[in-house]
From Swiss-Prot:
Organism: Brucella suis biovar 1 (strain 1330)
Positions with a binding annotation for L-tyrosine: Y39, Y176, Q180
Intracellular or extracellular location(s): Cytoplasm
Alphabetical keyword list: Aminoacyl-tRNA synthetase, ATP-binding, Cytoplasm, Ligase, Nucleotide-binding, Protein biosynthesis, RNA-binding
SUPFAM superfamilies given in the database record: Alpha-L RNA-binding motif (SSF55174), Nucleotidylyl transferase (SSF52374)
Protein name per Swiss-Prot or TrEMBL: Tyrosine--tRNA ligase
Length: 417
């Protein structure tokens, strides 16, 4: 059992969310005696967050569930600069229109985890572009910039590692940590916010905000970071061989999302159940005791629970049933991901490599070729050995479909359109 007084820190500790806290006892006391407003920042660098950001969303979820007020800060302003933390090179700058489109797309996911509204602990979604776009540069340098030591900023690992490799760090990117620190102070002024959370790579940026707040007269501010997660085999969370595991349903189907979690390594099952589901800890402990083939039942529960939170219980159970029919009963379920191919194209024939790319099982013909040559590709459960193979309408089965498979667990139905 953890020694925390507050429900929030106790929950995070028991479930493995905590990496560092700036003032553990002070934050615990504050959370135990009053409703605390806390935030996590999200940069709109793509139309969707991916599964690597899910741990941050779950932290906001538990914050609200334990009686506090979560704020999801969208980086409409800082997104135009780009976070240089632990990046090897500068990010490409995005247009205002792209940022706005990405923010609108990302917002839809949060409603599945948080309750928004005007209540004391209802969630807020805020765009830092509201205040950053209107900053007077000279006033900002005088009032905020004077509190920052360049010597200290150069000592942060996020910057130091980049410079040690003799990689360029632009003045634009260097300003990112100042803007993020200012966000913390501005959010305190606007919403009485006291806590910023994030991944462990954000520790330096968050502590900068605490220091700036102290120098600018805010109440005591706090930092809490979560560990940067990798799988037991060292792979980054949110990535798979097929690409990013997006949270938006229009970028990754509920079935493919379910499959990602079903494929969790044995050594990660207990940890992921604690972090990504709301199952009681005693139930998680029971599932963690399963061994041998039974561990697969725990993986199915993990996949279904994580998918239910994001896509809804019906979509999660449909994905689980589709997988059961496909892998256990050998049936061809129409709930598998489906790609339409024009009838004329099928009649003329399409190369298997191009079909793999079209079905989004691979990103390039070269990748598809390697899978074919490695014996991982099947059409209607028959192995494909020739990368020059042409697939045409003759491959349609009695249901008018072609089943295209990569490995044992990735299947797409090709349907004439």
């Amino acid at each position: 059992m953890s020694g925390f007084k507050s429900d929030f820190l106790r929950t995070l500790s028991e479930r493995g969310f905590i990496h560092q806290i700036s003032d553990e006892s002070g934050l615990d006391e504050l959370l135990a005696k009053e409703t605390v407003t806390a935030y996590i920042g999200f940069d709109p660098t793509a139309p969707s967050l991916h599964a690597g950001g899910l741990i941050q969303i779950m932290m906001l979820y538990w914050l609200q569930q334990t009686g506090h007020k979560p704020v999801a800060l969208m980086g409409g302003g800082t997104g135009m600069v780009g976070d240089p933390s632990f990046k090897d090179e500068a990010r490409k700058l995005m247009t205002e229109d792209t940022i706005a489109e990405n923010m609108a797309s990302i917002k839809r996911v949060f409603a599945n985890y948080l309750t928004f509204g005007d209540g004391a602990n209802d969630a807020l979604m805020v765009n830092n572009g509201e205040w950053l776009r209107n900053i007077n540069y000279l006033e900002f340098l005088r009032d905020v910039g004077r509190h920052f030591s360049v010597n200290r900023m150069l000592s942060f690992d996020s910057v130091k590692l980049r410079l040690d490799r003799e990689q360029s760090l632009s003045f634009l990117e260097f300003n990112y940590m100042i803007l993020q620190a200012y966000d913390f102070v501005e959010l305190n002024k606007r919403y009485g916010l006291r806590l910023q959370m994030g991944g462990s790579d954000q520790w330096g940026n968050i502590v900068n905000g605490i220091d700036l707040g102290h120098r600018m007269g805010t109440p005591q501010l706090y930092a809490l970071t979560s560990p940067l997660l990798t799988t037991a085999s060292g792979q980054k969370m949110g990535k798979s061989l097929g690409g990013a595991i997006w949270l938006n349903a229009d970028m990754l189907s509920a079935y493919d999302f379910w499959q990602y979690w079903r494929n969790t390594e044995d050594a990660d099952v207990e940890r992921f159940l604690k972090l990504y589901t709301t199952l009681p800890l005693d139930e998680i402990a029971r599932l963690a005791e399963l061994g041998g083939a039974e561990i697969n039942e725990a993986k199915k529960i993990l996949a279904t629970e994580v998918t239910a939170m994001l896509h809804g219980r019906d979509a999660a159970e449909e994905a689980a049933e589709t997988a059961r029919k496909t892998f256990e009963d050998g049936e061809l379920s129409e709930n598998l991901p489906t790609v339409g191919v024009h009838k004329a194209t099928l009649n003329d024939g399409i190369g298997v490599l191009a079909l793999m790319v079209l079905a989004e099982l691979c990103t390039t013909n070269g990748e598809a070729r390697r899978h074919v040559e490695g014996g991982a590709v099947r059409i209607n459960d028959e192995p494909v050995s020739d990368p020059r193979m042409v697939v045409n309408a003759a491959a349609l089965n009695g249901q008018g479909l072609i089943k295209l498979s990569l490995g044992k667990k990735r299947h797409v139905l090709i349907r004439p359109a």
